[in-house]
């Protein structure tokens, strides 16, 4: 179903509005770079700063540009269940191949509350594949492996989970509860290979917006059992993977993409530009990976 590298696209803005032309450029970069899917509206896309209509339009643009070449898995989660249901239904009707639903943030629900929340979403789109998005650092709560296993048994359309945490022990318990065929994706760039060695089927890594070919190849080698080749790519990508988090994601990502001419260096409040010191580190990193146009390297 879903596997490999599925880059989470940033949302490009121009003068405060969705920059559809830039979004199409980003889609082409990752698809032509060999990515195995595309995600829009995840953490990297700043969904919490957008209206539902803006999020819907971004999904439409990405689906139109992808044109069926690879699966599109939008992030459709929101704090309010009603908004999550509306956006998930929209993604399905628009032609997406699945949706990624974040663990509700800020309110810190208990495990029964999380079960009921995801059960409502699964019931609303019974034949539509769903990935749970586990990101405790942002959500303030983690969905337990036992809760995921219960959801998987009760709702066949809950097919996988994106794990954005350094806790690798979690994965072992998750596979025991949800089954070895549960589709787990790494959500922390530098842990792609370690998670895939435990059974994850791919990564949803922001680094793939910079280096789509290399991230896709790492996943392909790991899935084929070529761990020596995958390790070489793991260490090659390490600095870029770490650079994503030199400031709050997607600030470093968008900074470098703006230098590459792919989007404007623009965020929605409360996000803002990084420090000159981080910019200089990013510039040196981007030079080492050959990401900058020649005039930028000389600047």
Swiss-Prot record:
CDD domains listed in its UniProt record: DHDPS (cd00950)
Main location: cytoplasm
Species this protein is from: Thermus thermophilus (strain ATCC BAA-163 / DSM 7039 / HB27)
Record's subunit section: Homotetramer; dimer of dimers.
UniProt site positions, description: Part of a proton relay during catalysis: 43, 106
Job description of the protein: Catalyzes the condensation of (S)-aspartate-beta-semialdehyde [(S)-ASA] and pyruvate to 4-hydroxy-tetrahydrodipicolinate (HTPA).
Pathway involvement of the protein, from the record: Amino-acid biosynthesis; L-lysine biosynthesis via DAP pathway; (S)-tetrahydrodipicolinate from L-aspartate: step 3/4
One annotated GO biological process: diaminopimelate biosynthetic process
Localisation per UniProt entry: Cytoplasm
Disulfide feature: none
Active site: 133 (proton donor/acceptor), 162 (schiff-base intermediate with substrate)
Catalysed reaction equations from the record: L-aspartate 4-semialdehyde + pyruvate = (2S,4S)-4-hydroxy-2,3,4,5-tetrahydrodipicolinate + H2O + H(+)
Residues binding pyruvate, per UniProt: 44, 204
Keywords: Amino-acid biosynthesis, Cytoplasm, Diaminopimelate biosynthesis, Lyase, Lysine biosynthesis, Schiff base
Documented EC number(s): 4.3.3.7
Enzyme class: lyase
A Pfam family recorded for this sequence: DHDPS
Record protein name field: 4-hydroxy-tetrahydrodipicolinate synthase
Gene transcribed to yield this protein: dapA
Family: Belongs to the DapA family.
PANTHER family: 4-HYDROXY-2-OXOGLUTARATE ALDOLASE, MITOCHONDRIAL, DIHYDRODIPICOLINATE SYNTHASE
Cellular component terms per the entry's GO annotation: cytoplasm
SUPFAM superfamilies to which the protein is assigned, alphabetical: Aldolase
GO molecular function annotations of the record: 4-hydroxy-tetrahydrodipicolinate synthase activity
